[in-house]
Amino acid sequence: MRGCGILVIVLALAGSVACAPTHAGAPQVPLRGIYGGIPQEVVASGRSLREFGIDAVWLGSGSFTAERLAWLRAQRVQAYAEFNTLHVADALTAHPDAAPVDADGRVSPPPDGWQGICPTHGAYRAERMRAFRELLERFAIDGVWLDYHHAHASWEQATPNMPDTCFCDRCLQRFQKATGVALPDAPTSERSALLLSTHRDAWVRWRLGVFTDWVREFRDIRNATRPGALLGTFHNPWSDDDLNRARVEKLAIDLKAQAAYIDVFSPMPYHARFGHAADPAWISRQVSWLGAHLGVRGVPGERLRIWPIVQVSDWGEPVPVGQIDEVLRRGARAPATGVMVFAWGGLRAHPQKIEAIGRTYRALAGSVPPAD
């Protein structure tokens, strides 16, 4: 998700999302939210965040201050953090060997400007875990959402750019030790060719495990530091089979394995951005697939929850005002129990869109959209 340091606003279930009680069989009011900046325009119009329907806010982890947290509490909203895992490009200054290596043995250029990090770099990982722990220790927040937790790639567009990585010596050594597969003493290009053909299944499984193990450690830190906080993830919305299994084989995202550690999945089905501008139903199809894949129905009492983030602001293809209601309702349908809007920063100059969001949010607050 672009702009990891920006604010995220989300409308959650009344009261604390993490522990709000529900009665067996009672319908759930869908979480309703906005990503991309505190909506000062709402407050300036004379409405509080709660009057507009907002009762939870996500800030980039680096944006939290005592003053901002106090302001959020004064507004009677929940406070959550968005946490960048593998996209801290500045870290390459101190750790140049953390740059992902391509199949030819060269440093892979940042695809379309997106700079990923080698997931086996121990010092980088330790720094991110330390930052995660310090965030939870310093601020009494209600949860943290992982972001950019995937391999070196630029996938947030209609035509993704996803190079094969990482084939650094460290990754190849760890792969061999973990799997027992012996690679020949040969140039990286020859070794990577074997990994992408003869040993592809073992290579894919190993990479998935590397990224999942990060999630396990984040969960352990959360449990030890602030166990009442939710652990969520903003993630790629494709099914296992979309784009030749690219989410699995290129991005190294194993949703089922991560489900052992994650509380809330927030897929990013940006329909207009991803080539489905005239087909908002694509949103609910992707969310429906995710629910079936994870065994989530969107009923009270489930441990796992799905809160998609959907595109309402213009990014690439425009999203017309007349489409907003359907986009939000598609995102909020079961198995989802919530929906967020992407992105407030692109909405400030469009008051008609803001009001359309408000109308749908208030309608959703009094109804449960059916699945079809």
Residue ranges of each PLM-predicted region?
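Substrate-binding cleft/loops of secretory-pathway carbohydrate-active enzymes
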Residues: T225, L230-F274, V319
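Short, acidic/polar
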Residues: G36-E51, Y124-L135, R245-Q258, V319-R330
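Catalytic domains of carbohydrate-active enzymes, especially glycoside hydrolases
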Residues: G33-E67, R138-G143, Q258-V264, G331-V339
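Aromatic-lined substrate-binding rim segments of carbohydrate-active enzymes
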Residues: S45-V101, R205-T225
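Substrate-binding cleft of secreted/luminal carbohydrate-active enzymes
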Residues: Y261-P280, L290-A371
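The substrate-binding groove and active-site-proximal loops of carbohydrate-active enzymes
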Residues: Y35, I54-G60, P111-M129, S197-T212, ...
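Aromatic-lined carbohydrate-recognition surfaces of secreted/lumenal glycan-active proteins
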Residues: Y80, W145, R200-R247, G301-W315
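Active-site-adjacent "subsite" loops/lids of carbohydrate-active enzymes
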Residues: Y80-F139, E156, T188-R200
